[in-house]
Amino acid sequence: MKKVITTLLSLLLLGSPAIAQRIPVEGWYKMVSAEYGKSWRDSGKRTHFHSIKRFGEVSIFGEGFGFKGKSESEFGLTILDDNLSGSIVARFNWISEKNPLSGFEGHSRCEITAGSTICVMWFDGYGEFEGKILELSLNEKEQIDKENVSGFDLYMLEGLVMDEPSSAIPGGG
């Protein structure tokens, strides 16, 4: 009887949406243009920006998953010192090139050290990607010679795509 109960519990847990399939993905984000709003300096000589909007292209792929589209982002908190070290918190909307009613919305938290950027990003799918989530890291591609780059920044993306887990929070998604 103990074996039967153990087997049934195992099947129940393995079939549970709480253990969603996680597909490793990788790709690229290329910043094409930016609009900078007003900025100001604090007493520590760090620059704060009221608004930065960036536009770019994104491509992500993995086994049985692919996404290519346009990126629109708004940086809600940007603080940089004279050495280009600081923090950025941003919101993103990635719009599918196949269907503009589908894509991913999300946010990121980035740390910048001497101009080199590392971010953690979270996204929720909409349209044909409804019910999917992306959890990614963004790393600035080291091979780019910043002195000779004209017009764009290139970032490497790595992470997971999965089904959104069931909400355990009352009133949560």
Model-predicted regions and their roles:
Residues 1-4:
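Positively charged n-region of N-terminal signal peptides that target proteins for export
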Residues 6-7, 25:
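Intrinsic disorder/low-complexity segments, especially N-terminal tails and targeting/processing regions
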Residues 7-15:
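Bacterial N-terminal signal peptides
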Residues 16-20:
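Sec/Tat signal peptide C-region and signal peptidase I cleavage site
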Residues 21-173:
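Beta-strand-enriched cores of mature, soluble protein domains
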